[in-house]
From Swiss-Prot:
Function: Binds to the 23S rRNA.
Any one Pfam family match given in the protein's UniProt record, by short name: Ribosomal_L9_N
Top-rank taxon, per record: Bacteria
Single GO molecular function: structural constituent of ribosome
Protein name: Large ribosomal subunit protein bL9
Gene: rplI
Organism: Cronobacter sakazakii (strain ATCC BAA-894)
Amino acid sequence: MQVILLDKVANLGSLGDQVNVKAGYARNFLVPQGKAVPATKKNVEFFEARRAELEAKLADVLAAAEARAEKINALGSVTIASKAGDEGKLFGSIGTRDIADAVTAAGVDVAKSEVRLPNGVLRTTGEHEVDFQVHSEVFAKLTVNVVAE
């Protein structure tokens, strides 16, 4: 099925690309999420008329994401207190929600879906590097200090 992409899609293309995808992928994911429209003659003409507007909108979203990433990088570090044993092992763990709440409390709005923990949840005290994917192309890093209560 031929579709016109309205947004950048990983491993597929970027704004304005006409790509051939399986019908189920287009029907169940791309079209409902607003990432693509079927490549009919009417939609192609409509898209070409709105191309500049859509590109400007994407540029604004990217600029806003870069600004948020700069704010996250400017924070430097965030401290989270949690109950821990004598050897520095936490009772429980610190996950994406806890980190997102701590960063939001520090003054930068972050959704838990933007927090990336490549090594899984934090289970020990100390400093941990945490990645944030604010946009599909924009990443930020932050140090999370986990201290015992």
